[in-house]
């Protein structure tokens, strides 16, 4: 995660982290959002510092409250619809259970943002979530996020 992040990018990262945590079912979205906004969680990320796997904690720019809260509120309000859109976009040989939790949180945040902020250009949303995905994965997941969010965005625009 060595790329310089903006407050809006940090908001998206925080939303992904919050939805990942929400996926464990131990806290409400409101509880998790408060913890992020208070800086109790999500203020740092682990970054590899060399080719040997050495890691250190690196501070993250604070999230922009409007974007972060908007993504989480959109997910809370539309969770069933968002998860159905993600499920419908999966390849025929994939099931929802096969989608790893981090990847699912990235997709959930991306779709929630597309719903909550239709004025944000789709290309910006796609680039941001593809960039986020590349912080966690190096393989096909990057193409999966790009393709699925692109297809969902097209479906939302035509609805």
Model-derived segments and spans:
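N-terminal interaction/assembly modules
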Residues: 1-159
């Amino acid at each position: 995660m060595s790329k310089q992040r903006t407050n809006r990018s940090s908001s998206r990262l925080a939303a992904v982290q919050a939805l990942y945590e929400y996926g464990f079912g131990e806290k409400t979205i409101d509880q998790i959002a408060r913890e992020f906004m208070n800086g109790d969680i999500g203020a740092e990320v682990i970054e590899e510092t060399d080719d040997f796997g050495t890691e250190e904690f690196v501070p993250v720019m604070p999230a922009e409250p409007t974007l972060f809260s908007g993504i989480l509120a959109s997910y809370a309000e539309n969770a069933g619809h968002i998860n159905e859109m993600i499920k419908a976009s999966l390849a025929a040989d994939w099931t929802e259970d096969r989608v790893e939790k981090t990847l699912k949180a990235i997709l959930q945040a991306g779709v929630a943002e597309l719903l909550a902020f239709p004025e944000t250009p789709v290309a910006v949303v796609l680039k941001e979530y593809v960039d986020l995905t590349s912080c966690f994965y190096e393989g096909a997941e990057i193409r999966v996020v790009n393709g699925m969010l692109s297809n969902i965005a097209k479906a939302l625009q035509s609805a």
